[in-house]
């Protein structure tokens, strides 16, 4: 449903932020 879709979008956004932070730290 919509809730599952929103959860997937949130996870994608979180993963992007985490990867960006890792690149900055490196």
Swiss-Prot record:
Q: Main site of residence?
A: secreted
Q: What does this protein do?
A: May have cytolytic and antimicrobial activity.
Alphabetically, the GO molecular function entries are: toxin activity
Q: Where in the cell is it found?
A: Secreted
Origin, by domain of life?
A: Eukaryota
- Native species: Oxyopes takobius
GO CC, alphabetical: extracellular region
A GO BP annotation: killing of cells of another organism
Its keywords, alphabetically, are: Antimicrobial, Cytolysis, Secreted, Toxin
Expression sites (tissue/organ): Expressed by the venom gland.
* Protein's recorded name: Oxyopinin-3a
């Amino acid at each position: 449903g919509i809730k599952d879709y929103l959860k997937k979008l949130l996870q994608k956004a979180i993963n992007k932020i985490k990867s960006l932070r890792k690149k900055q730290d490196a």
